[in-house]
Amino acid sequence: MEGVTLPIVIVVPAENSTISSPLHVEGEAQGSWFFEATFPIELHNAAGAVIATGYGEATSEWMTNEVVPFKGTLIFPSQPSGAPGTVHFKKSNASGLPEYDDSIIIPVMF
């Protein structure tokens, strides 16, 4: 939809891409996704277990309602080749109130 800005756009990893450790992530998110210039990222294996955690870190001024580029790195243990997994990008929510939660999940392959 023209004129609509998504709250977060993931550039790397692409959906269903094959990943290996270290996994470098990058994209753009609205400034409201960050708290202290970061937001959490989790990598889940085929069983849904969290196998790595890290942060998307703003690479420019984050205290804005505009889009902010981010990068991050996740280091994870070896997984069976061809097994599915998911990368969870989670909006920072300093308030802890569920109405401010947001996330996007990207499917990947190991």
What residue ranges belong to the model's regions?
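Ser/Thr-rich low-complexity repeats and stalk/linker segments
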Residues: 7-14, 18-24, 28-110
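Proline/serine/threonine-rich low-complexity linkers at boundaries of modular beta-sandwich domains
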Residues: 1-6
